[in-house]
A protein has these predicted regions:
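Compact beta-rich and alpha/beta scaffold cores in large eukaryotic transport/transcription complexes
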Residues: 1, 6, 91, 100-102, ...
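Catalytic and substrate-binding regions of extracellular carbohydrate-active enzymes
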Residues: 1-73
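Residue-identity detector for threonine
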Residues: 5, 19-22, 93, 108, ...
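Generic structural motif
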Residues: 7-9, 37-41, 60, 71-73, ...
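Acidic (Asp/Glu-rich), glycine- and aromatic
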Residues: 51, 62-101
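Beta-strand-rich recognition/accessory modules
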Residues: 80, 101, 108-155
Length: 155
């Protein structure tokens, strides 16, 4: 999801009831284009007015690419990555990796940089429903209005 917090209120594209989603197959990729706005749970925009968000997903056998076009007004991509406290997590500004039982999950950042939201002492947040711990990654654009681009794959 794309999120913006302003005066303690979260505005997210997940809350937008007027989201437009298109799906198509192209060159072996299953693509989803999602056009929405950042709104709070009451469908209200931030004080500066409508904030348009375009998120594009490209799924392939190798993994998934996610891009956010024109990430405006201090918004960022929220990426909660499931990671048990026993799994080794490494995070830099351009790459994150989580060592799983059967391989390594990689997240590479081509545009923007990786940040970690506040966590518990083990570097994760526990969500009692559905019962998973996760590393709360945020992908921040280099500057307002810039693109975010990440790739996720498992080896």
């Amino acid at each position: 999801r794309v999120e913006l917090t302003q005066d303690g209120v979260a505005y997210s594209n997940l809350d937008d009831l007027n989201t437009d989603i298109t799906c198509f197959i192209e060159n072996g990729f299953c693509r989803f284009n999602v056009n929405s706005h950042l709104v709070n749970i009451n469908q209200q925009s931030p004080k500066q007015g409508e904030v348009l968000v375009e998120v594009n997903y490209a799924f392939s056998e190798q993994g998934v690419s996610i891009s956010v076009e024109r990430c405006n007004d201090s918004a960022y991509l929220v990426l909660p990555v499931i990671a048990s406290p026993k799994e080794e997590v490494r995070i830099s500004t351009r790459e994150a990796s989580i060592k799983k039982n059967k391989g390594i999950l990689y997240i590479t950042c081509e545009a923007g940089y990786i940040d970690v939201a506040p966590t518990d002492s083990d570097g994760r947040i526990f969500n009692p429903v559905p019962g998973f711990s996760f590393a709360p990654l945020r992908i921040i654009p280099e500057s307002i209005g810039k693109k975010i681009q990440i790739n996720i794959y498992f080896c």
